[in-house]
Amino acid sequence: MRHLGRFASLGLVASFATIVVAVTEVHSSPRGDRGRSTERGAALVPQVRSLLAAKCFACHGPDEATRQAGLRLDTIEGQRADLGDGFVSIVPGDAEASEVFARVLEEDPDLRMPPPEAHPRGLSSDEVDLLRTWIEAGAPWGAHWAFLPPSSESTAHSLRETIDLEIAERLHLAGLEPHGRAEAAAQLRRVSLDLIGLPPSAEEVEAFLADPSDAAYGAAVDRLLASPRFGERWARWWLDLARYADSKGYEKDDGRTVWPYRDWVIRAFNEDMPLDRFAMEQLAGDLLPDATDETRLATSFHRQTMNNDEGGTSDEEFRVAAVVDRVNTTMEVFQGLTAACAQCHTHKFDPITHEEYFRLFAIFNQTADADTPDEKPTLAMKVDLAWLDAPLEAKVPVLERVAEEARRETRILAGGSFLSPTELVEPGVPAVLLADRIGVSMPRDRLELAAFLFAAENPLTARVLANRIWAELFGTGIVETVEDFGIQGSPPSHPELLDALANALREQGWSLKRFLREVVTSET
């Protein structure tokens, strides 16, 4: 398998080429051909959305508390708003009649937008051209791409064929030629590092080179996927996402017993536990109807938060900090969203309100753990280690739901401070994730949230995980900002390929090994 490191900027080249083509075609299109013009303008929406998010949304975006002059530019209704006195924010098809565009060109610094004190350089000439072209093309808008369901168009091609076709097409558009196939020894070394994190032994290289058959590479891939080192290599990837640490952090940074969770992750990957079950046990293993010590151990995913053993600290302050960390980690890992920005105020760029953040918080707020030196609740486990004469009892911090009579009420914390509780809220998720698509009811606990995240209609989870795996293999994600699928994140360099990967991951039963085999046996 050849890595795309040398083509890391290919997606950007292709995206830029798309923009140039779209801009050129719009300017050369007949003025009356509104249908074609709008269709071409739609190609510019991701770039326009990113531009407005970076330069305008802080004052004219989702956050009502900081919105200036009543102007909102993150919705089509706000963009088309009548500002009074004959002024309209954006007039589709007529940039010169659009007040937003006029303010961008305004020479008076007191009237120019964005304000010089916020953006001293204003918009570049390329950004002005992009805005003008988009408005002249009808100012199309619509939901952010990541909140739309992946394309489900059927294809006669396998995933590996789809990968090769998509990459070859973009190389052609960019005027690039693919490199020839790597030498056999290099192929084996690369796939070994990808799948088990170790180079092949001299004996393995010799055996591979001695077999010239077409089946040799596939057999090597199968051997690597079956290796116990596979789980160790991919556990390193996951444990980084889970913020795993063998110490508690803060000033004392004492050690803690969490390695059984690490070993659980390794076992799960070696056994090819489906990723939806893998996630469900970590998010809510204690709530499963058939909960076992193993599923409870998996909830240590939530207990990787820092723990403060210093005297004189507020237990409630650090308990709240731990719940906040769980909300932020869950949304970032599985949804690719920077929900943390809504902890103190409504998100400045993405459609997540301050209230919706604390509805998520309420889902994680019903746990029995606290910021204490013993890190209760813990799970006592007998562990047999080869170098010990007797089994070792490990007490692993896990998550446990509080008793019904001890359930906490959840209030919005003004400014994110545990000292400033305000209105009561019920458990839930941001409305943008519902959008009348998800085939489950509003989640009210961690188990329902896990089901919600992996519902077939959820537009984010499969894309985010497929992109994370792709980035782990190739060094760069199809969405370069692997942690941010929101409005300020990078648009996908190959959107059709990303959707094909997401659909395949789900259709293959969330099997990591099957997914990896398809990718590493492609010509890419």
Q: Predicted regions span which residues?
A:
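Short metal-coordination and nucleic-acid-contact micro-motifs, chiefly zinc-binding Cys/His arrays
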Residues: 52, 334-340
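Primarily short, surface-exposed interaction patches in extracytoplasmic proteins
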Residues: 122, 157-189, 194, 198-229, ...
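Short cysteine clusters
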Residues: 56-59, 341-345
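Solvent-exposed helix-loop boundary motif
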Residues: 21-132, 136-164, 168-169, 185-190, ...
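Short pre-active-site segment immediately N-terminal to the catalytic Zn-binding motif
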Residues: 322-332, 456-461
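N-terminal export/targeting leaders of redox proteins
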Residues: 1-42, 224, 238, 245, ...
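Juxtamembrane loop-transmembrane helix junctions in multi-pass integral membrane proteins
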Residues: 3, 319-326, 442
